[in-house]
């Protein structure tokens, strides 16, 4: 092999064509021409390339710090927008935006300082435009009036008590307090026909239009506009709640409910009635329709005003007696409902002693009814109670039910006739048997039609538990147990014998009386227990051994109603020896049975 490991080249041979290896000297010499050298040394082919002026040393370090600060602030704002703004969360996931572990609070007015960077300002404009697009509703743009109303609402909401501000403005405008003309309804659901409404800052054109639009809703309109307040007295055709009234006026007047005060007027205040009456004569007040009755009552003078109606207790007693109201609450409520048409009821409501009057009325009605009941025979009582039952039923349902219980109907009718006549040792009926055989249903239906009383042995610890039998013609003790049988065997033998007993009465002296016919229901047959052998002759018993039948719809197959008993008594009136008493009951049907008022009903009108 050759020893040459490479090629030896002369670099001068390769690049001698374009590389100058030695400097070339110019033939022209400047040694003798120094002046020309100095003249050409300062000249240049390019003008003003170098500024030969004096340089001013600036504060370069301050400029550098300022640039670094702006750059750092810009980066900080970008990080805040990336990790804090909701736009970043929205970009990650639309559903993630609705998830929040902390409660939502209103943002502070200036949480972050406004930056001046170009890119940040562009991002802010994008976020603002997107938010505005989401919040723009489908309604047309608001008018100048809507903008003004929104500003008024915002001004009101700045106050801690908006209602107090409106009431102060009302008193400043009309010279009278809003509470002096109205009474307060705490519930927004309570209905009333008459409403007083004060509206703040309403457009004049809308007020004029409301005069015509409210005619279809109201029987009487009273309107007075004293800027910035507008006062309405509206008597609607039907009762309306506060919610309905505010919704109606908000629609008609284009105002927010914050700008409204609504309460019903005072109906018994003479001063309030005079305010409305005299105000209607003001030429600046718009009034349409007839005056409400409560304004006329308080302001106009008529032939009845000379003698103010005084309350007559006897009229109230007659009302309760005719309708058979014994309970104090029922008497008070039903009589107060007559105040719109009855002068005596109106005087009752104006009285400061309503509770005492109601108590006295209920007491007198019970006295009258007790005296009338004692005067009546059983036949008259039954006839009177059957007259109050409307329509007729099937008497055969009662007969079929008695036969269904394997009871001889003729035997039952004989015992039932002696029971109604309250004969000694025959005035107590016992219906015994297993549960669900119809014992309580049968006896309760008879108590219902004859308006009897039910005694409860649960009150036996009280000495007055037998007091209700003093005010009835028929009594019932339901579900008699061994404890009750022992009590009857020890203490009530004389009563079952038909003799007089001494009955303890609450708040009254003990009275002497006989027991009325008494019915008992029990699961115990005392006729087979010698423990109660002294009651065997005093109690007439019937066994109900068959379960009460029901149809496919779980309704009773035997209709034991008031109508059924009415038909039963009318059908068997003669068999029960009630015929003579029926004739007595028919006498004087056209005449009032009892008159407890001082006025002569037969005199001139």
From Swiss-Prot:
Compartments it resides in: Host nucleus
EC code: 5.6.2.4
Reaction equations catalysed: Couples ATP hydrolysis with the unwinding of duplex DNA by translocating in the 3'-5' direction; ATP + H2O = ADP + phosphate + H(+)
Positions occupied by motif Nuclear export signal: 92-101
Alphabetized GO MF terms: ATP binding; ATP hydrolysis activity; DNA binding; DNA helicase activity
Pfam family, one: PPV_E1_C
Keyword Lyase among record annotations: no
Transmembrane segment boundaries: none
Binding site for ATP: 433-440
UniProt entry tagged with the keyword DNA-binding: yes
Region (DNA-binding region): 145-308
PROSITE patterns, sorted: SF3_HELICASE_1 (PS51206)
Motif placement: Nuclear localization signal: 80-82
PTM-bearing positions, type Phosphoserine: 85, 93
Keywords: ATP-binding, DNA replication, DNA-binding, Early protein, Helicase, Host nucleus, Hydrolase, Isomerase, Isopeptide bond, Nucleotide-binding, Phosphoprotein, Ubl conjugation
Gene3D superfamilies xrefs: 3.40.1310.10, P-loop containing nucleotide triphosphate hydrolases, Zinc finger, large T-antigen D1 domain
Example GO BP: DNA replication
Record's protein name: Replication protein E1
Species annotation: Human papillomavirus 9
């Amino acid at each position: 092999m050759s020893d040459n490991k490479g090629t030896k080249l002369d670099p001068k041979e390769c690049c001698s064509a374009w590389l100058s290896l030695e400097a070339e000297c110019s033939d022209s010499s400047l040694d003798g021409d120094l002046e020309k050298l100095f003249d050409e040394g300062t000249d240049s082919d390019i003008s003003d390339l170098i500024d030969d002026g004096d340089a001013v040393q600036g504060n370069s370090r301050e400029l550098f710090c300022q640039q670094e600060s702006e750059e750092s602030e810009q980066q900080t704002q970008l990080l805040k927008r990336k990790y804090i703004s909701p736009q970043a969360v929205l970009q990650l996931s639309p559903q993630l935006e609705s998830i929040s572990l902390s409660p939502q609070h209103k943002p502070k007015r200036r949480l972050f300082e406004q930056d001046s960077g170009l890119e940040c300002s562009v991002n802010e404009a994008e976020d603002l435009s997107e938010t505005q697009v989401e919040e723009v509703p489908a309604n047309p743009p608001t008018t100048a009036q809507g903008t003004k109303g929104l500003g008024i609402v915002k001004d009101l909401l700045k106050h801690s008590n908006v209602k107090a501000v409106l009431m102060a403005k009302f008193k400043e405008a009309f010279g009278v307090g809003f509470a002096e003309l109205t009474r307060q309804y705490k519930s927004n659901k309570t209905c009333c026909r008459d409403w007083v409404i004060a509206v703040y800052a309403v457009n004049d054109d809308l007020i004029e239009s409301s005069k015509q639009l409210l005619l279809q809703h109201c029987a009487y309109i009273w309107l007075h506009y004293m800027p910035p307040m507008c006062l309405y007295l509206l008597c609607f055709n039907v009762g309306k709640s506060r919610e309905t009234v505010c919704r109606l006026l908000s629609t008609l007047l284009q105002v927010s409910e914050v700008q409204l005060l609504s309460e019903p007027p005072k109906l018994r205040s003479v001063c309030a009635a005079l305010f409305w009456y005299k105000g209607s004569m003001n030429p600046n007040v718009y009034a349409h329709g007839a005056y409400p009755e409560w304004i006329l009552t308080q302001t106009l003078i008529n032939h009845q005003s000379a003698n103010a109606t005084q309350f007559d207790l006897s009229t109230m007693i007659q009302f309760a007696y005719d309708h058979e109201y014994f309970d104090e609450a029922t008497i008070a409520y039903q009589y107060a409902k007559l105040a719109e048409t009855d002068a005596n009821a109106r005087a009752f409501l104006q009285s400061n002693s309503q509770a005492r009057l109601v108590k006295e009325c209920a007491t007198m009605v019970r006295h009258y009814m007790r005296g009338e009941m004692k005067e009546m025979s059983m036949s008259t009582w039954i006839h009177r109670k059957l007259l109050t039952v409307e329509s007729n039923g099937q008497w055969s349902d009662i007969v079929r039910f008695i036969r269904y219980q394997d009871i001889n109907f003729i035997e039952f009718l004989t015992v039932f006739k002696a029971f109604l006549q309250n004969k000694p040792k025959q005035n107590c009926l016992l219906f015994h048997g297993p549960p669900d055989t119809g014992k309580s249903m049968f006896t309760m239906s008879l108590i219902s039609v004859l308006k009897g009383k039910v005694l409860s042995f649960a009150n036996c610890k009280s000495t007055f538990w037998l007091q209700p039998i003093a005010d009835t013609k028929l009594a019932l003790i339901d579900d008699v147990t061994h404890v009750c049988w022992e009590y009857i065997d020890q203490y009530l033998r004389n009563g079952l014998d038909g003799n007089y007993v001494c009955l303890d009465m609450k708040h009254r002296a003990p009275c002497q009386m006989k027991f009325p016919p008494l019915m008992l229901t029990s699961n115990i047959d005392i006729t087979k227990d010698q423990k109660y052998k002294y009651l065997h002759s005093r109690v007439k018993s019937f066994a109900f051994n068959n379960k009460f039948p029901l149809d496919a719809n779980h309704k009773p197959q035997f209709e034991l109603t008031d109508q059924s008993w009415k038909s039963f008594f009318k059908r068997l009136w003669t068999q029960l020896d009630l015929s003579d008493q029926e004739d007595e009951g028919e006498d004087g049907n056209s005449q009032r049975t009892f008159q407890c008022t001082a006025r002569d009903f037969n005199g001139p009108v």
